[in-house]
Amino acid sequence: MRTDLFDFELPAGSIALRPASPRDSARMLVVQPGSGVRDQQVSDLPEWLRPGDQLVVNDTRVIAAQLHGRRIGREAEPRIDATLIKRLDGSRWSALVRPARKLMAGDIVRLGNEGRVCFLGHLDARVESKGEEGEVTFAFSFHGPMLDQAIAELGSTPLPPYIASKRAPDDRDASDYQTMFATHEGAVAAPTAGLHFTPEIETALRGRGVGLHRITLHVGAGTFLPVKVDDTAGHRMHSEWGAISTETADALNAARSRGGRIVAVGTTSLRLLESAADDDGRIKPFTGETAIFITPGHRFRAVDILMTNFHLPRSTLFMLVSAFSGLETMKQAYAHAISAGYRFYSYGDACLLFPERAGA
């Protein structure tokens, strides 16, 4: 499909720079193809679900992936800004670096603002290789848990570019940019639909007989990358690591066999569930990488309802929601959201999407 079909104009003032407080006071646009839209709040979510429905959340935890430092060992020592994007092994990460032109293979970058050091000393990273568009492979001076602790001490919250370009990260973001489910460290971007949840709404959902299950997908920075090709067929999707336990897969399959619906909280949960489902819609245990790219025409096998935020134009995520609820439906829903003052992107409001009906 042509990527310009997924374009739309978004006023700059629609981008949320802080989350709603309390989290479940965010607005929620309910989209039912063929039945229009309804303006609600996230706290209304239990009313839209039935006993036996199963919510699936992503329990990944965002690491302090934004690092600053200087190149050392040559005459000039330019400042280097790096965002970790994917762990390769116990001591190596892929990172997006600015300015990448200042680095070559073999260079050493000493990380930490103004000579700041971590508990083990300096954190040095050797440039192992350079890729396209500012991507480099770093080989760090520490390994395993020691490297993780050094990154946690020296790094900061990796805010999305549409927020970071307008303000610097601060102490509030360290908690605001984590979901209440965040457990397994490894993401460099939050699974933002989960940011809307509070203990109160979890209690209300359980009281209604809705189950809640955790899966893990370590969200990468590729989630923010625009689709630069003219046709979706030419786009190379980023891969991310995920896991679904046998216990969770069995529980979801059993609930669905009894008539319960699977409600994916976020596109990350949906992508992992769809990656793990067979042709009959049964979810299999899963551990590994997924690079699933969902566009209109995809047959959804594992997910019945999707709760998600509002996404960027021409993004793979807007393509995904258009596949789920229909392109024209989503364009109309987004036009309504913009005119009604909904807040967009990571810290913004939510949508509750129902699927496009077959033959619609």
Swiss-Prot record:
Transfers and isomerizes the ribose moiety from AdoMet to the 7-aminomethyl group of 7-deazaguanine (preQ1-tRNA) to give epoxyqueuosine (oQ-tRNA). Its main location: cytoplasm. This is S-adenosylmethionine:tRNA ribosyltransferase-isomerase. It comes from the Bacteria. Monomer. The keyword Transferase applies. It is found in: Cytoplasm. It is an enzyme of class 2 (transferase). Keywords: Cytoplasm, Queuosine biosynthesis, S-adenosyl-L-methionine, Transferase.
